[in-house]
Regions:
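Boundary at the C-terminal end of the N-terminal hydrophobic targeting segment
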Residues: 10-12
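S-adenosylmethionine/decaboxylated-SAM
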Residues: 17-223
Length: 223
């Protein structure tokens, strides 16, 4: 019995090691792709670093889950005893990709959860890092920042804060909700503007990083 359990544990460890290696290889592949092939590849290293300082990560807008690779790499590498990931998107990811990401998370000992939902209609959860890459409009990001920021302990990271959606709203999309409060200026456009206005309202947050490459990537830090 003892020998059987030892062999079983060894088999599980071998499988976990293989998945850990595969996660690293998949991350490296996407992180090395040029902007023409991957619109967030150049920022995976930032997500990895920020997640490396976090116990709980929330991702709003998972898309093809490439960004999730960076977050899982960081969670896997940190020394925290608690490691949790929550992804939220209006669309269900490709089943094969989602299953593979889930396996990667399990091998990294990350408590993994995906929710199919409108992020403006769910209750925010406390987290160390919030990453946002959803509908690229001023009003959408403004509402997300106001709703989720009170629950964020350390960092808020956002993609697409430079060209083309830094100063323009993404066209051809129906607003997720029409219940916009009166204090949102209906003439404002773009994610950069949404970030700047959020910072003006919330002195408890400061801009830590602003990268202009690969459509832009901005990091806010709680002070």
């Amino acid at each position: 019995m003892c020998l059987f359990l030892f062999c079983l544990d060894a088999s599980r460890q071998t499988k976990s090691d293989a998945l850990t290696k595969k996660l690293k290889e998949t991350y490296d592949l996407w992180a090395s792709k040029p902007k023409s092939e991957c619109d967030i590849g150049e920022h995976l290293k930032h997500l990895r670093r920020l997640a490396g300082e976090s116990e709980i990560v929330v991702e709003l807008g998972t898309r093809g889950m490439v960004s999730t690779l960076g977050l899982l790499m960081g969670l896997q590498e940190n020394s925290k005893s608690v490691k949790k990931y929550l992804g939220v998107d209006l669309s269900y990811p490709d089943k094969t990709i989602l299953n593979q990401i889930h396996r990667f998370a399990t091998s990294a000992r990350v408590d993994f959860q995906f929710i199919l939902a409108n992020d403006l209609e769910i209750d925010p959860v406390e987290c160390d890092l919030l990453f946002i890459d959803t509908l690229h409009t001023y009003r959408q990001l403004t509402l997300e920042l106001e709703k989720f920021s009170p629950k964020v302990k350390k960092y808020i990271a956002m993609h697409d804060t430079d060209e083309p959606w830094g100063w323009e709203d993404e066209p051809n999309f129906t607003a997720v909700t029409n219940n916009y409060p009166d204090w949102i200026n209906p003439t404002k456009r773009g994610l950069f503007e949404a970030v700047e206005d959020f910072l003006a309202r919330h002195p408890e947050w400061v801009k830590q990083e602003q990268h202009t490459n690969c459509h832009g990537f901005t990091v806010l830090k709680r002070v």
